[in-house]
């Protein structure tokens, strides 16, 4: 049996080796044929591209624009907005990341070849003429260089040139903050030629609209992006007329942050100051400490609200609201000071009035015992004792002094006639009751007018 297996292997061995050799040779042949096809074609194209570039740049002068002295060079521009933000209110600037593309025709770069276009690296940028475009309102600008310079140069066989690059620009945006924080802004990005006037370079928008990336990746934080506009205009200067291109980005502020940080605390502080109207007027420490605390709180809120703004000379919507809230809080404190002052002065005046109405000392000695009793009774029971809580009684003795005569009429002789005409009777002890109605009503009316004016007008 082993002998038969050995004979079978010897008989089939040459056939297996022959088949393996044939398959190996076929595999090598296919690989070589594919490899030759893959290598030879790019090699021919590379040689052709090198010859084209050498011939184009042989007598090319990159210091001269295309068609110089014949006609102006038309530059078609396009912008792709990669991201916008953040926006700095204090510095009045915003950051934008864009892909900036410029297209023009240069007859000196025409070539005849089977190649439709040549896509070149950044080394060729410095060897041909490119527009001297600059951004007029940029404070700082950076071109991206990682991992290689983010620039593209493409030349078509008809002389068309495309030059794109990625830029991050910190541009100036003059914010008008009168309606802060319900404000809207239009932040421009302005560019033009630095040295060529309109007679030599004319900028045109390649498309009517500008593309933007997904806005969810933008870092606008306090703002919402509402739209953009692209325009062109002619700027007249002493050096000539220049084509100026502008892209305006419309932004509206989100006021949720400021509502939580400023508006709601101010409203609650004003409401808290009204609590003193329900505290007894003889609780001087409680009412005074509450009034001073609310005034200091409003001072702190006013300082914090200005922290997010530049030092502008005009009043903003938030400044107006905080100032009015401060006035309400301060008025609540002054209300108790006025009440305490008037009530404190009323008691000495009443005491002096009672003394003035007492009969002279000699009049008390009367020959009749009954008369003495009458006089004593008069002394004991007239004028009647008036409790402090009954100061608002219309029949209470009249206050003497300028306060009484100026602000209300309480003298019996002037209840009718010229003294009463045009006067309003005000009860001092009811000043807290008046304030409980007046302060909330006035503050509510102010809020209605304020929010309608700034949100809808």
From Swiss-Prot:
Disulfide bonds: 173-187
Intervals, Cytoplasmic compartment: 340-433
Glycan attachment residues as annotated in the record: 35, 112, 230
Chief location: membrane
Location(s), subcellular: Postsynaptic cell membrane; Cell membrane
Pfam families per UniProt: Neur_chan_LBD, Neur_chan_memb
A cellular-component GO term for this protein: postsynapse
Tissue: Abundant in several brain regions, including the ectostriatum, nucleus rotundus and hyperstriatum ventrale.
Keywords: Cell membrane, Chloride, Chloride channel, Disulfide bond, Glycoprotein, Ion channel, Ion transport, Membrane, Postsynaptic cell membrane, Signal, Synapse, Transmembrane, Transmembrane helix, Transport
Keyword Cell inner membrane: no
InterPro entries per record: GABAA/Glycine_rcpt, GABRG-1/4, Neur_chan_lig-bd, Neur_chan_lig-bd_sf, Neur_channel, Neuro-gated_channel_TM_sf, Neuro_actylchol_rec, Neurotrans-gated_channel_TM
Membrane association type: Multi-pass membrane protein
UniProt GO BP: chloride transmembrane transport; gamma-aminobutyric acid signaling pathway; inhibitory synapse assembly; negative regulation of chloride transport; synaptic transmission, GABAergic
Extracellular side: 22-256
Superkingdom of origin organism: Eukaryota
GO MF terms held by the record: GABA-A receptor activity; GABA-gated chloride ion channel activity
NCBIfam families per the UniProt record, alphabetical: LIC (TIGR00860)
Miscellaneous field: This subunit carries the benzodiazepine binding site.
Oligomer status and interactors: Generally pentameric. There are five types of GABA(A) receptor chains: alpha, beta, gamma, delta, and rho.
Family statement: Belongs to the ligand-gated ion channel (TC 1.A.9) family. Gamma-aminobutyric acid receptor (TC 1.A.9.5) subfamily. GABRG4 sub-subfamily.
Function: GABA, the major inhibitory neurotransmitter in the vertebrate brain, mediates neuronal inhibition by binding to the GABA/benzodiazepine receptor and opening an integral chloride channel.
Protein name per UniProt: Gamma-aminobutyric acid receptor subunit gamma-4
Species of the source: Gallus gallus (Chicken)
Gene from which the chain derives: GABRG4
């Amino acid at each position: 049996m082993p002998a038969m297996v050995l004979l079978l292997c010897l008989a089939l061995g040459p056939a297996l080796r022959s088949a393996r050799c044939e398959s190996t040779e076929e595999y090598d042949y296919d690989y070589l044929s594919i490899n030759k096809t893959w290598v030879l074609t790019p090699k021919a194209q590379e040689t052709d591209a090198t010859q084209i570039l050498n011939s184009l740049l042989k007598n090319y002068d990159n210091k001269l624009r295309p068609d110089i002295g014949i006609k102006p060079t038309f530059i078609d521009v396009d912008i792709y907005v990669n991201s916008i933000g953040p926006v700095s209110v204090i510095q009045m600037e915003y950051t934008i990341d864009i892909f900036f593309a410029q297209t023009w025709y240069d007859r000196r770069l025409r070539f005849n070849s089977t190649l439709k276009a040549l896509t070149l690296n950044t080394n060729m940028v410095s060897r041909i003429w490119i527009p001297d475009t600059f951004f007029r309102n940029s404070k700082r600008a950076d071109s991206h260089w990682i991992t290689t310079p983010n620039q593209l140069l493409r030349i078509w066989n008809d002389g068309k040139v495309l030059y794109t690059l990625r830029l991050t620009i910190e541009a100036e945006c003059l914010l008008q903050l009168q309606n802060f924080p319900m404000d809207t802004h239009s932040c421009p990005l302005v560019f033009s030629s630095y040295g060529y006037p309109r007679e030599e370079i004319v900028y045109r928008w390649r498309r009517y609209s500008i593309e933007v990336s997904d806005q969810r990746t933008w870092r606008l934080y306090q703002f919402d992006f509402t739209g953009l506009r692209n325009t062109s205009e002619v700027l007249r200067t002493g050096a000539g007329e220049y084509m100026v291109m502008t892209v305006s980005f419309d932004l509206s502020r989100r006021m949720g942050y400021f509502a939580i940080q400023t508006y709601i605390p101010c409203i609650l502080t004003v409401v808290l100051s009204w609590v003193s109207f329900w505290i007894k007027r003889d609780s001087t420490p409680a009412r005074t400490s509450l009034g001073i605390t609310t005034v200091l709180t409003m001072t702190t809120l006013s300082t914090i609200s200005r922290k997010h703004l530049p030092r502008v000379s005009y009043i903003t919507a938030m400044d107006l609201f905080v100032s009015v809230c401060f006035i309400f809080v301060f008025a609540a404190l002054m209300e108790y000071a006025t009440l305490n002052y008037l009530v404190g002065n009323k008691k000495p005046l009443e005491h002096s009035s009672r003394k003035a109405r007492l009969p002279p000392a000699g009049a008390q000695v009367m020959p009749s015992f009954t008369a003495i009793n009458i006089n004593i009774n008069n002394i004991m029971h007239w004028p009647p004792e008036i409790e402090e809580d009954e100061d608002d009684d219309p029949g209470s003795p009249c206050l003497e002094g300028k306060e009484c005569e100026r602000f209300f009429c309480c003298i019996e002789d002037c209840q009718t006639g010229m003294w009463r005409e045009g006067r309003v009777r005000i009860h001092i002890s009811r000043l807290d009751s008046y304030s409980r109605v007046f302060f909330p009503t006035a503050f509510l009316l102010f809020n209605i007018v304020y929010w309608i004016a700034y949100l809808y007008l």
